[in-house]
UniProtKB/Swiss-Prot annotation:
Its main location: nucleus. Keywords: Nucleus, rRNA processing. One of its GO terms (biological process) is rRNA processing. Component of the ribosomal small subunit (SSU) processome. Belongs to the UTP11 family. The keyword rRNA processing applies. Residues 1-23, 199-229 are annotated as: Disordered. Involved in nucleolar processing of pre-18S ribosomal RNA. Disulfide bonds: none annotated. This is Probable U3 small nucleolar RNA-associated protein 11. The keyword Nucleus applies. GO terms for cellular component: nucleolus; small-subunit processome. The lineage of its organism: Eukaryota, Viridiplantae, Streptophyta, Embryophyta, Tracheophyta.
């Protein structure tokens, strides 16, 4: 019987809208909005209750090492930075791994540049097809020449589809971006290699501009010669 009772069509009870006199106060809160707001309120209320309970049971003499190894910034605990976390040898090993990763990136980019350049070079320097014509007299030669000129003019750059033009322009932009990326990576690799060499033992000094034979914007160092055993 319950299924029959539920099958009877009933009037849909709609929630009332905001009265005309209170339209200036905005939309009237619906029941589903009230449920969301009430859940959020009770959740915050429960969190505050638990925090108050923790504070009431707190031992004033308790101590954790995190109390001296961290500090609060805007009410949030932040761990203090460790000054000498790694030794010199460990730092050297980490930098060597980073240099290997950068070198791998340079080699990968150079391969992509080579592949892209060869593809664009083939598009720009496409060899024309050869066709041999046989003519009986001068008039026929002139006619064939005019026909070839018309055909070559119709196959010019203006008749290339715009889709192909856009794709070629995009490939040239990609090639230029990859070349710039390789330059940046090579500069970064050179800087890291220099810093690694400067960390090694041995007396060294930075050369002045008048001592450098090949002028460069980068710093140049000279190591003192050591006698090999």
């Amino acid at each position: 019987m319950s299924s029959l009772r539920n099958a009877i069509q009933r009037r849909a009870h709609k929630e009332r809208a905001q009265p005309e006199s209170r339209k200036k106060f905005g939309l009237l809160e619906k029941h589903k909005d009230y449920i969301v707001r009430a859940k959020a309120f009770h959740q915050k209320e429960e969190t505050i209750r638990k925090l108050k309970e923790k504070a009431s049971f707190r031992n004033p003499d308790e101590f954790y090492f995190k109390m001296i190894n961290s500090k609060t910034v805007d009410g949030i605990h932040r761990p203090k930075p460790e000054a000498n976390k790694y030794t010199e040898d460990e730092l050297m090993l980490l930098k060597t791994k980073d240099m290997g990763y950068i070198l791998q990136g340079i080699q990968s980019e150079k391969k992509k540049i080579e592949k892209l350049s060869s593809m664009l070079h083939e598009l720009d320097n496409k060899r024309p097809n050869k066709h041999v014509y046989f003519a009986e007299d001068r008039e026929e030669v002139k006619e064939i020449q005019s026909r070839i000129e018309q055909k070559s003019s119709s196959l010019g750059l203006d008749n290339i589809p715009s889709r192909i033009k856009r794709k070629t322009a995009s490939s040239y932009r990609e090639l230029e971006e990859r070349k710039q990326r390789v330059q940046k990576l090579e500069k970064l690799y050179a800087d890291m290699a220099l810093q690694k060499e400067l960390k090694k033992p041995g007396r060294k000094r930075k050369l002045r501009e008048d001592e450098i034979e090949n002028q460069t914007s980068r710093p140049v160092y000279k190591w003192r010669a050591q006698r090999k055993r």
